[in-house]
Amino acid sequence: MTIEFSNFTFKYWALEKPTLKNINLTIGKGEKVVIVGPSGSGKSTLGQCLNGLIPFAVKGDCSGSLKINGKDTKSLDLHQCTNIVGTVLQDTDGQFVGLSVGEDIAFALENQMVIQEDMHTIVKDTAKMVELDDILDVSPFDLSGGQKQRVSLAGVMVDDVDILLFDEPLASLDPKTGKAAIDIIDHLHRDTGKTVIIIEHRLEDVLHRPVDRIIMMEQGEIVANMTPDQLIASDLLEQHGIREPLYISALKAAGCQITEDDKPAYFSTLNLDKFKPQIENWYHQSFVACTPENSERLLTVNNLSYSYDGIKNTLDDVSFHINKGEFVSILGKNGSGKSTITRLIMGVLEPDTGSIFMNGQDLAQSSIFERSQKIGIVLQNPNHMISHHMIFDEIASGLRNRGINEATVERKVFDILELCGLKKYRHWPIDALSYGQKKRVTIATILVLEPELLILDEPTAGQDYHHYTLMMEFVRELNRKLGITILIISHDMHLVLEYTQRAIVIANSQLLADAPVNTIFSQPALLEKANLTVTSLYSLAHAMGIERIDNFIHCFIEHEAKNK
Ligand SMILES: Nc1ncnc2c1ncn2[C@@H]1O[C@H](COP(=O)(O)OP(=O)(O)OP(=O)(O)O)[C@@H](O)[C@H]1O
Ligand SMILES: Nc1ncnc2c1ncn2[C@@H]1O[C@H](COP(=O)(O)OP(=O)(O)OP(=O)(O)O)[C@@H](O)[C@H]1O
């Protein structure tokens, strides 16, 4: 199935200007391509033109043509498009049709009239590939964010379509499952010859397996269309605010010049010998010792246990503390209970046993409202938080609830809109925003309230590097200047390395480790237990024969922080 966009332009009815401008792009049958680009650049819109959601479900004006296998999509209907293109959507909640995980995976098979006996086997085998076989009877809506993402992946794997489109398949997946997902996509691609299109901000993770081409979008246009080696060796990623792989950042930090001939797109193909002297030199020159942590307690979690069903403990005797002014992360496998900890801190759930103290006060004595005055939480899925139609009102709502006068509300909201890169959208309805832009709105809504403890659940999911850097630098400023304590829950190891000092690792419902990030990331066996993976920074140091990998990681963290 060849895909051919010719002079293709698309404008949403709700917007004045076109979102896709004069796109000329051919994707050949059986190709595997990645689409990258800043948030709001039109990646999902391009994907939706392919799967027929545009123009059949979402209205707008198109000009030029989009042909799939020579057929203009204007002559097809939505049903015909979905029979050609299978999609894993960015917001998985909108995608579930079954009452259980098993039914959901089986849905596509029912449509294909697969016989019952085969159906059970196919569903089981597919669920096993994405580690869902234990929870086939659970409702998709009772799953953690990453588990939902796995259900969507499984659903599309059984689809009998020629083109597979993945819109941010990795956003909520833990690192190990993310790698497994990329392996699965790679197998599907090689075994079936299907055309595969992956839209993703986590470029290094996608490049875990080879791809044919990377297409870069910016403001509705295609600004690059080249091989991964060409792109990684160029300055284009940096210019367009897209994060380069960690090992490339480390090589550049050491002053190495990387060319296409070095085959830099994959760690496994990169010729490292050439760079060894520079890396060693940089490491020996830049090592500085860790700064000691502040020891005044803000939050103390004591022996916390919680079970949703009264049978299996989601959290089992978990204890940790967070000091005032710290920037800490919680890491762990999908479904290990990280978001559950957040719900217990907020008071949405009550612990079965154990307690949580804030500033020496037992939170069991405080209502949800009282807790929300001190603790701000940004949930994983922005669509679970938004309750107003207009962006300004959404961000202003918390301040207005506190009875703050309108002039102050306006000033604070404008300041935060600017900081979060949302100023030009202030009069927009939230519906007209991309997923990443919505996520930024929800972060702005909480940041404007300047909480004492800020908890960010997957802050970078769906965010491009440029926007997330702006936002995280602002969060870091809140942390450094105002002493606001920050807790992030994330599967984004690059983010965790860049910003947090200490990581709390949860595995199999229990606390597995609580240590500085450079210590955590230099222990492969520990990472493995929590479905985390070593980063390419570790692999680089290892390949260079550096003994104290924790020190090497620490050097890199210091370098990044200084050069932001
Ligand atoms: N349903 C819609 N109605 C009107 N405008 C929309 C709609 N969906 C997206 N847009 C607009 O189109 C632009 C591109 O959005 P799109 O979702 O394609 O971006 P994206 O590159 O996928 O971003 P992200 O990485 O944040 O998901 C955005 O500026 C957004 O405001
Ligand atoms: N409302 C609910 N009812 C029943 N079980 C639930 C509910 N919410 C979560 N669970 C289960 O509790 C476990 C922990 O979920 P939680 O959302 O805390 O995980 P998580 O570590 O945040 O995962 P992720 O990294 O995927 O976001 C999961 O196995 C999930 O299926």
Curated annotation (Swiss-Prot):
Topology relative to the membrane: Peripheral membrane protein
Positions of ATP 1 binding: 37-44
CDD domains according to UniProt: ABC_cobalt_CbiO_domain1
A molecular-function term among this protein's GO annotations: ATP hydrolysis activity
Stored SUPFAM superfamilies: P-loop containing nucleoside triphosphate hydrolases
EC number(s) per entry: 7.-.-.-
Entry annotated with the keyword Calcium: no
Compartment(s): Cell inner membrane
Record NCBIfam families: PRK13648.1
Protein's name according to its UniProt entry: Putative ABC transporter ATP-binding protein PBPRA2240
Organism field: Photobacterium profundum (strain SS9)
